[in-house]
């Protein structure tokens, strides 16, 4: 074994030249005002803040004065020379070297010393969807990452194979942060790999150091901060907890699986519906206050409703003579808002007659982890046939790991899709067959993982071949008790831009259908009246009326279970509530009870306040139809079908 010094940039400067004590105190106060909340949230002791500011201002990387990297070659005791030679000749023998970071300074390291905080640089920062492209295009990046990860190449290895190896191994090295401000896109999680020094720090359940990502605003640069949790003597190892913050032993075991492989096959993968306390906690977390019981308000025949809305598509398209727009929220009979109501109690007390476009507790439908939970009422712990098998990574990680390993053992398809609980437009959504990747994605935003549809029903596009497509229906919920549910007769289609295959999992235009938010991507437009005859031509044994009947059966079952229990376990029966949702679904090939191939609808998500731009453009009466059905109880002639 050998030890080498850690990275060195420049000597640590001991003072800020030309700065008076008063100026130094002022600079520290400004630094604390700007960065204090982030530092406190990360647990960085205040005794380090002064020296941290100095190191940030002057880019002082002085870890090399205190630490060294020890390289340990682990040799199998039982292995003879011949076997060792054979292993060395293999194309990629893997990481035979183990690295440790140790304290090399003779005087050791004192946790109480204000200088005992260190900056770690980041070698690579990216968003997951750009990783492959950067490895292929950024000069030197692939070589540096391969070296850092211990990927050795004997002979000429194709770069595509090298890239694939790095993309798999990087989940042992990736760390994540996200910005607190900006657009939805700007707040997407960023993944980074620390430099060679930071990446050599190993795990310990009782670590000697803590680390935290830190974004230094004046320079717009991200670092990782490293500080000791106790005093260390020379020769002691620097370690951190790779599962920091998690105390449950089983979940820790799962989180550490990328570094410490473990067999979870004996654990049940069963995921029953969560208990009532789970839903009560969600209600409290959402700060939603349930309404009091009220009597429905009856308006005189011919009453003209004043509508207050901040939804531009409603304001531009609603022309029905029974509705008039008002700029005064206080005068409105109907509130059709884009943002979520929270205080239904106050509304029910002060303005019980005001109609609104949402139901208390409708997040049970529109948030993906809740959707999966309530769906189990229809299909048991495995879920119903119309919803892909889904696990909440925050609460059901062990069950998911067990299920993944079971499928792996039986040679079954193991492609999965990670989705945030509550984002649309495929933001921060990833298709993968890497268990390590899924486990690590849990550390960014709250996510579910759903079985990726490996055998979707495809649509032949003459220009590109057979592609994935999804279907969007608009459903109108008139009331919870009794359940009254309608579906708009026109549906909308979205298509992938490249022929489908279970490869290139980060190829957005192959695996995703949401193209209408990227100005650089072509949106394939096919209207439903054109789609149906073309679909039946491609699949003559599957009449669209039969396929749609199965889709409507799935919608009916979903809303029945969503409304079956009182709040917060189900949607609240508030007489003044109405709602419009978009249900996105795909079709997959499955086997029916008789063994014949069937098209099984797969509900992907339910969206509150969907984008209705295409609906308004191609069907000018759309919002007149919606308002007549929901608020006038006059669905006749409104292009809707009653489901319940």
Curated annotation (Swiss-Prot):
InterPro entries, per the entry: TTL/TTLL_fam, TTLL12
Compositionally biased residues, Basic and acidic residues: 1-13
PROSITE patterns: TTL
Annotated tissue distribution: Expressed in the basal layer of prostate and endothelial cells. Increased expression in prostatic intraepithelial neoplasia and metastatic lesions.
Primary localisation category: cytoplasm
Taxonomic superkingdom: Eukaryota
GO MF assignments: ATP binding; histone H4K20me2 reader activity
Keywords, in A-Z order: ATP-binding, Cytoplasm, Cytoskeleton, Immunity, Innate immunity, Nucleotide-binding, Nucleus
UniProt: ATP binding residues: 450-453, 468, 470
Domain TTL, chain residue ranges per copy: 300-644
Region (Disordered): 1-25
Compartments in which it is found: Cytoplasm; Midbody; Cytoplasm, Cytoskeleton, Microtubule organizing center, Centrosome; Cytoplasm, Cytoskeleton, Spindle
Subunit relationships: Interacts with MAVS; the interaction prevents MAVS binding to TBK1 and IKBKE. Interacts (via N-terminus) with TBK1 (via protein kinase domain). Interacts (via TTL domain) with IKBKE (via protein kinase domain). Interacts with tubulin alpha. Interacts with histone H3 and histone H4 (when trimethylated at 'Lys-20' (H4K20me3)). Interacts with CBX3.
UniProt similarity note: Belongs to the tubulin--tyrosine ligase family.
Function according to Swiss-Prot or TrEMBL: Negatively regulates post-translational modifications of tubulin, including detyrosination of the C-terminus and polyglutamylation of glutamate residues. Also, indirectly promotes histone H4 trimethylation at 'Lys-20' (H4K20me3). Probably by controlling tubulin and/or histone H4 post-translational modifications, plays a role in mitosis and in maintaining chromosome number stability. During RNA virus-mediated infection, acts as a negative regulator of the RIG-I pathway by preventing MAVS binding to TBK1 and IKBKE.
Protein name per UniProt: Tubulin--tyrosine ligase-like protein 12
């Amino acid at each position: 074994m050998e030890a080498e010094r850690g990275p060195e940039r420049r000597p640590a400067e001991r003072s800020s030249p030309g700065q008076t004590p008063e100026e130094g105190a002022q600079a520290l106060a400004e630094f604390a005002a700007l960065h204090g909340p982030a530092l406190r949230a990360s647990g960085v002791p205040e005794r380090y803040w002064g020296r941290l500011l100095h190191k940030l201002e002057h880019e002082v990387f002085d870890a090399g004065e205190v630490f060294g990297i020890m390289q340990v070659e682990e040799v199998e005791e039982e292995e003879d020379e011949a076997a060792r030679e054979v292993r060395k000749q293999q194309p990629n023998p893997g990481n035979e070297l183990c690295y440790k970071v140790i304290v090399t300074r003779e005087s050791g390291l004192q946790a109480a010393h204000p200088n005992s905080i260190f900056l770690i640089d980041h070698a690579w920062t990216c968003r997951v969807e750009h990783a492959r492209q950067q490895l292929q295009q950024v000069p030197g990046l692939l070589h540096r990452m391969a070296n850092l990860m211990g990927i050795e190449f004997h002979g000429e290895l194709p770069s595509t194979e090298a890239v694939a190896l790095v993309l798999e191994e990087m989940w042992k090295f990736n760390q994540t942060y996200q910005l607190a401000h900006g657009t939805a896109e700007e707040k997407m999680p960023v993944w980074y790999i620390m430099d060679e020094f930071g990446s050599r720090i190993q795990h310990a359940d009782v670590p000697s150091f803590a680390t935290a990502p830190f974004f230094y605003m004046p320079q717009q640069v991200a670092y990782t901060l490293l500080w000791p949790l106790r005093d260390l003597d020379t020769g002691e190892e620097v370690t951190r907890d790779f599962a920091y913050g998690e105390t449950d032993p089983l979940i820790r075991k799962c989180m550490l699986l990328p570094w410490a492989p473990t067999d979870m096959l004996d654990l049940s993968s069963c995921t029953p519906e969560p208990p009532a306390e789970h839903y009560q906690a969600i209600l409290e977390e959402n700060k939603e206050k349930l309404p009091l019981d009220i009597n429905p308000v009856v308006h005189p025949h011919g009453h003209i409703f004043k509508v207050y809305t901040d939804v531009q598509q409603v304001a531009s398209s609603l022309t029905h003579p029974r509705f008039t727009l008002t700029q005064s929220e206080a005068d409105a009979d109907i509130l059709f808002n884009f943002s979520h109501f929270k205080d239904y109690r106050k509304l029910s007390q002060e303005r019980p007659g005001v109609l609104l476009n949402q139901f208390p507790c409708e997040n049970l439908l529109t948030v993906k982890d809740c959707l999966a939970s309530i769906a189990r009422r229809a299909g048991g712990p495995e879920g119903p046939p119309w919803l892909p098998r889904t696990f909440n990574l925050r609460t059901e990680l062990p069950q998911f790991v067990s299920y993944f390993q079971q499928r792996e053992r039986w040679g079954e398809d193991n492609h999965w899709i990670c989705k945030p609980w509550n984002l649309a437009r495929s933001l921060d959504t990833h298709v993968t067959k890497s268990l390590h990747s899924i486990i690590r994605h849990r550390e960014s935003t709250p996510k579910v993982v759903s079985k990726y549809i490996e055998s979707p029903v495809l649509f032949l596009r003459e220009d590109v071949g057979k592609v994935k497509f999804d279907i969007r229906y608009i459903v109108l919920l008139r009331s919870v008790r009794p359940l009254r549910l309608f579906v708009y007769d026109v549906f909308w289609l979205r298509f992938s831009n490249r022929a489908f295959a279970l490869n290139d999992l980060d190829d957005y235009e192959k695996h995703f259908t949401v193209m209408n938010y990227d100005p650089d991507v072509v949106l394939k437009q096919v209207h439903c009246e054109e789609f149906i005859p073309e679909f039946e031509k491609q699949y003559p044994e599957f009449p669209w009326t039969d396929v749609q009947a199965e889709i409507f059966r799935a919608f009916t079952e979903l809303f029945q279970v969503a409304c079956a229990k009182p709040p917060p376990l189900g949607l609240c029966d508030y007489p003044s509530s109405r709602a419009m949702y978009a249900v996105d679904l795909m079709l997959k090939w499955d086997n029916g009870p008789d063994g014949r191939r069937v098209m099984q609808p797969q509900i992907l998500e339910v969206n509150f306040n969907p984008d209705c731009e295409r609906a308004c453009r191609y069907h000018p009466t759309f919002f007149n139809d919606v308002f007549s059905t929901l608020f006038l109880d006059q669905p006749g002639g409104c292009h809707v079908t009653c489901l319940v």
